[in-house]
């Protein structure tokens, strides 16, 4: 009985290992130079102190990880769709002015550490001075490209 359970656990572990290997092979990491030029320029313009440590691609998106842990998602054309700086403040150069005015007008004691741009507008994750986080959804469609 114990041998049967151990054999089943071993078989499940082997299956997980094989499936994760296949999954990794389906989306191997790319060199940073294979990001679209627009995405490369975005990183250079807004994160000049950081370097790209990993790039993954699917059929219609790119995920870029920087050396400070920042994760940036781009669409297939190289336009950013998500920037997540974890606990750090995001650079504000690329955030639409009206979004910044709204956020800092309504949440003056917060910093933005994540911004997501979608078809319905923006979602931002804010962090208070005490370290608490909240998410705010804002509809500003004029600045989407």
Show the residue positions of the predicted features.
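Bacterial N-terminal signal peptides that target proteins for export
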Residues: 2-11
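Bacterial Sec-dependent N-terminal signal peptides
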Residues: 3, 21-27
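Bacterial N-terminal signal peptides
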Residues: 10-21
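Interaction-mediating elements
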Residues: 26-145
């Amino acid at each position: 009985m114990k041998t049967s359970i151990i054999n089943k656990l071993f078989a499940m572990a082997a299956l997980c290992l094989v499936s994760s290997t296949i999954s990794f092979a389906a989306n191997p990491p790319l060199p940073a130079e294979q990001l679209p030029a627009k995405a490369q320029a975005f990183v250079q313009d807004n994160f000049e102190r950081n370097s790209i440590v990993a790039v993954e691609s699917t059929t219609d998106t790119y995920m870029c990880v920087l050396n400070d842990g920042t994760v940036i998602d781009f669409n297939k054309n190289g336009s950013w769709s998500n920037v997540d700086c974890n606990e750090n403040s995001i650079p504000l150069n690329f955030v639409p002015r009206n979004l910044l005015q709204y956020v800092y007008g309504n949440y003056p004691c917060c910093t933005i550490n994540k911004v997501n741009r979608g078809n319905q507008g923006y979602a931002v994750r804010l962090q208070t001075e005490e370290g608490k986080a909240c998410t705010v959804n804002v509809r500003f469609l004029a600045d989407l490209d």
